[in-house]
A protein has these predicted regions:
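Canonical Radical SAM [4Fe-4S] cluster-binding loop centered on the CxxxCxxC motif
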Residues: 70-109
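Short charge-dense sequence patches
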Residues: 1-16, 42, 59-68, 89-100, ...
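Solvent-exposed, flexible loop/coil residues
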Residues: 41, 77, 83-85, 166, ...
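Flexible, acidic/Gly-rich N-terminal and inter-domain linker regions that tether
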Residues: 1-79, 87
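A broad, structure-centric signal for solvent-exposed, well-ordered loop/edge residues
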Residues: 44, 52, 82, 86-88, ...
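Core AdoMet radical
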Residues: 96-200
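Short low-complexity stretches enriched in small and charged residues
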Residues: 31-32, 45-47, 82-84, 134-137, ...
Length: 200
């Protein structure tokens, strides 16, 4: 099975850039009126030619969002489980070179914080950690996710890159969603941003 990285590396970015920049107002209008958005139409909506259509883009986005999710707004609260990190990224407050006090919540801390969040009426929780497999990795998640799952109707997590089997295990532990943020997919820029990266 091809990974996301494999597929990403196969893309011809010079060709994509030329195609995006070559789109016209007519291409944008066609894309705005299309019922489906194939890649070529999406390129039109991302192109400089689309800059004069921001209001129409916003209206289309709102229609599609309401069609998909209805008229609901959900709020979540982040629970910072740990700011330990084994990486040194130029853009991140958790970066290992930052001289800050490090804290990893234990069972009592988590119980206290989650009770306070529930008292405020929130039912959707986003768990946040730095990237430190040894101290805030799967063993830590196995210990603490089941108790949190019992208290919240939605449990999501921003987490370091894991193996596919570990993502499946997080789901079994009660996680509804996982977010892994990649600040850039441009490999030359990534090297500049990630001074030390244990997942590269």
């Amino acid at each position: 099975m091809k990974t996301f990285s494999d597929r990403w590396r196969q893309l011809d970015w010079d060709d994509i850039r030329l195609r995006i920049n070559g789109k016209t107002a007519a291409d944008v209008e066609r894309a705005l009126n299309a019922s489906q958005l194939p890649r070529d139409d999406m390129m039109a909506l991302l192109s400089p030619a689309a800059s004069g259509y921001l209001e129409q883009l916003a209206q289309r986005a709102q229609r599609l969002t309401r069609q998909r999710f209805g008229n609901t707004v959900s709020f979540y609260v982040p629970l910072y489980l740990s700011n330990l990190c084994a990486n040194d990224c130029t853009y991140c407050g958790f970066s290992m070179s930052n001289r800050i006090k490090r804290k990893t919540l234990d069972e009592a801390d988590i119980a206290r914080e989650s009770a306070a969040i529930r008292e405020m009426g929130f039912e959707h929780l986003l768990l946040v950690t730095g990237e430190h497999q040894a101290k805030v990795g799967m063993d830590y998640f196995r210990r603490h996710l089941p108790a949190l799952r019992e208290q919240f109707s939605s449990l999501q997590m921003e987490v370091q890159p894991l193996a596919e089997t570990e993502y499946a295990e997080l789901k079994q532990l009660g996680l509804d969603g996982v977010m892994v943020y990649q600040e850039t997919y441009h490999e030359a820029r990534l090297v500049i941003c990630l001074l030390i990266n244990h997942h590269a």
